[in-house]
């Protein structure tokens, strides 16, 4: 099976301190991979590099067998890689629907497309996007919340909205930073159900998580980091 993400010998140092040392792993499509490790083990730095927010000192990234040269947040998003931060990056004064629509308008491909379409086509496209947003709200358990201000949602619902915004951009690889942090047990189960549903649709999920018991129970592969190195890998295929 062709890996959706192939990470080879990634290195990163800050002021002489090695944060990542020859980090190498592959993630298979349609799976959920969990990354564990103590604070400072390199997990977040690794996700920063994959999502284009930080430049590696060395090593290579391959997405669907294609090298990612000089990754930036924009170029990575165009490929179909999306990032959800521990503290959701949403517009709290806008409605859930407007956040979803805004996400699609901010997609690089969407901005380019608007230069080549006629006004009537834009109206039709907007109707199509609204329909898509309604579908995604259902997929992320936010149906019935479309008209509500995003800032009025619970913290867990805001995380689900962030996931929905990636889906509006047709992301196929989702990087989730601590999706279970700051939410209660019921919401953890809720978020887990959404992730399981996305997996069934063929989405691939990578997550950093300190709730090791829950993350291990729903993931296909677990990677353990220590001092910037991937020390162990467990998966259901072993």
What is each residue range found by the language model?
Residues 51:
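Helix-to-loop junction immediately C-terminal to a conserved catalytic motif
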Residues 59-67, 78-79:
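Conserved ABC transporter NBD signature motif
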Residues 174-178:
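Catalytic Walker B motif of ABC-type/P-loop ATPase nucleotide-binding domains
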